């Protein structure tokens, strides 16, 4: 398996896990058990009004990955690149998607 395939698997696995866990993220076990049975959640359920919805955690994971990729490209082209700053800028772009006033 190539590095790119492993990276894609990590991103997909994170998103799928987030979508499975989002409906129960802030619930206590007795509430989860009452809604989904003793086995807990085992299939996609509604979160934020959407079945299989991802949360802000997956959104930020993807924006962080985009920042890492952008930093890699900048570094590969021998441009000055401060990786934390590039990732910070990527996360600021995420913040603007959350109806937050632009800080970029």
Language model features: what each stretch is:
Residues 1-104:
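Structured, active/binding-site neighborhoods that engage oxygen-rich ligands
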